[in-house]
């Protein structure tokens, strides 16, 4: 049977842990087996207690204190230490057959866009433990208010997609907070979800320094040429929204294809007697 590893990624405060908790709650409510894996060595609080926790192996506080590293350097060191101790990870997660593992990842963007550690970890899970990985990248919907920030987020998402090389789902999180913003129409929202690169030209060029216009044009061309980044809306507090995202993860990992058909419910003896 299939084993799925969903890596929930994104910048700090994008709602990763909240989404992980919502996904865990929904899957438990529909009877699906899942476990939370915390790979953030600086994490503090969780809605669901992690089944596997990198802090049992190494803590970023210890690294920063003993090696005098900053937060980002400490995080990279923790992941390098994890890669040197994959036997620990194999032992922790190797027994979870036919299960979903939801990986709650740190918020440092360089881990997804610049450093090759995470792709190496994903390949290990694929080859050694036979997991089917999927990346779920969260971008906060409030970025839509500032188009330049939104496209910076799009470029980060695209960089993560290229770096990680696994099925990838991009989410605009905290959509419930966007409902109070009357400056974004439904038509505009659709353009953001489909990442219309022309949103970066026109009005923006009227308010930015002319020396950046050519840069804007090049970014538009890059996004248009790759045509990789689209978004799904996410409200972590909305069960229907979480269910929809889960269906996309299932499709990306081909989870449905490996499910055995269930036997039809049998009539109870009393029901059969009544029919007679």
From Swiss-Prot:
Keyword S-adenosyl-L-methionine: no
Top-level lineage group: Eukaryota
Pfam families attached to this UniProt entry: ATP_bind_1
InterPro entries noted in UniProt: Gpn, Gpn3, P-loop_NTPase
Assigned EC number: 3.6.5.-
Chief location: cytoplasm
Residue ranges annotated as motif Gly-Pro-Asn (GPN)-loop: 70-72
Location of the protein in the cell: Cytoplasm; Nucleus
Chain segments annotated as transmembrane: none
Binding site for GTP: 13-18, 173-176
Compositional bias ranges of the Basic and acidic residues kind: 259-269
Single Gene Ontology MF annotation: GTP binding
GO cellular component, one term: nucleus
Alphabetized UniProt keyword annotations: Cytoplasm, GTP-binding, Hydrolase, Nucleotide-binding, Nucleus
Protein family membership: Belongs to the GPN-loop GTPase family.
Subunit structure: Heterodimers with gpn1 or gpn2. Binds to RNA polymerase II (RNAPII).
The protein, known as: GPN-loop GTPase 3
Organism for this UniProt entry: Schizosaccharomyces pombe (strain 972 / ATCC 24843)
């Amino acid at each position: 049977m299939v084993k799925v590893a969903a890596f929930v990624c994104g910048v700090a405060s994008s709602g990763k842990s909240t989404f992980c908790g919502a996904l865990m709650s929904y899957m438990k409510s529909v009877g699906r087996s899942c476990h939370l894996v915390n790979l953030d060595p600086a994490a503090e609080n969780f809605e669901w207690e992690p089944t596997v926790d990198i802090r049992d192996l190494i803590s970023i506080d210890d690294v920063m204190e003993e090696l005098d590293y900053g937060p980002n350097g400490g995080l990279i060191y923790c992941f390098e230490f994890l890669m040197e101790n994959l036997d620990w990870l194999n032992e922790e997660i190797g027994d979870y057959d036919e299960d979903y593992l939801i990986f709650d990842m740190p918020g440092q963007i360089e881990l997804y866009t610049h450093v090759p550690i995470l792709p190496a970890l994903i390949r290990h899970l694929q080859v050694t433990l036979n997991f089917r990985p999927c990346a779920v990248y969260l971008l906060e919907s409030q970025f839509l208010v500032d188009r330049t920030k939104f496209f910076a987020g799009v470029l980060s998402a695209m960089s993560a997609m290229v770096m990680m090389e696994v099925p990838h789902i991009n989410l605009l999180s905290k959509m419930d907070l966007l409902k109070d913003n009357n400056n974004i129409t439904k038509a505009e929202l659709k353009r953001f979800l489909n990442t219309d690169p022309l949103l970066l030209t026109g009005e923006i060029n009227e308010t930015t320094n002319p020396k950046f216009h050519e840069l804007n044009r090049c970014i538009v061309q890059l996004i248009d040429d790759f045509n990789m980044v689209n978004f799904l809306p996410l409200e972590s507090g909305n069960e229907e929204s979480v269910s929809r995202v889960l269906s996309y993860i299932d499709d990306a990992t081909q989870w449905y294809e490996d499910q055995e058909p269930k036997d039809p419910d049998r009539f109870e003896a009393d029901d059969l007697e009544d029919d007679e």
